[in-house]
A protein has these predicted regions:
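Generic N-terminal targeting/processing segments that precede catalytic cores or assembly contacts
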Residues: 1-93, 105-109
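A generic, well-ordered mixed alpha/beta core segment in the N-terminal half of proteins
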Residues: 103-115, 119
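Mobile "lid/hinge" segments at catalytic clefts and subdomain interfaces of large enzymes
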Residues: 130-140, 145-146
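Acidic, Ala/Val/Gly-enriched low-complexity intrinsically disordered segments
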Residues: 157-159
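Cytosolic, long alpha-helical scaffolding segments
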Residues: 93, 117-119, 141-143
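Short, conserved aromatic-histidine micro-motifs
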Residues: 38-54, 118-135
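Conserved small/polar residues in nucleotide/adenosyl-binding loops
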Residues: 149-155
Length: 159
């Protein structure tokens, strides 16, 4: 029998599979943005996670987040870049206009993997938060288009 946890954000609680690494925003988005039935491509996930990793490093350097939080985020990103947890990026490839749903799916997965790195359980956002820490200094209006630009660079004749 599938077990669930109750994850909550500013919009309220959402029933999430207990072993899931995504959170409440993603739980809602899976239902709201079921356009194609296909999640985002793994190369987009990789590109996006690289941006999140870089932001965590920059936020540690400026002391916007503490080293413990930042290091956990970096380690979580490294695990995802190594191919782990990619199955947790479930938001449909066609989602909200500026990629907000994909951005939040990414923030929640990175946060929950980082929480496990810290020895915590998924959803214990009082220790590390998807918006306050993983998304710090970022906007999906910037990160989403940059990730697509990043995807084109390795195969571009201009590089």
């Amino acid at each position: 029998m599938l077990k669930y946890r109750s994850d909550k954000d500013s919009l309220g609680p959402v029933k999430i599979p207990a072993d899931a690494y995504y959170g409440p925003f993603t739980g809602r988005a899976i239902k709201q943005y079921n356009v194609t039935g296909s999640p985002s491509h793994r190369n987009l996930i990789k590109s996006f996670v690289m941006i999140k990793r870089s932001a965590a490093v920059a936020n540690m350097k400026t002391k916007a987040i503490n080293r413990k939080q930042g290091t956990a985020i970096v380690k979580a990103c490294d695990k995802i870049l190594a191919g782990k947890f990619v199955d947790q990026f479930l938001v449909d490839m066609i989602n909200s206009g500026a990629g907000t749903a994909f951005n939040m799916n990414s923030n929640e997965v990175i946060t929950n993997v980082a929480l496990r790195v810290l020895g915590k359980k998924q959803g214990q956002y009082e220790f590390l938060h998807p918006n306050d820490h993983v998304n710090m200094s970022q906007s999906s209006n910037d990160t989403y288009p940059v990730s697509y630009t990043h995807l084109t660079l390795p195969t571009s004749d201009l590089v």
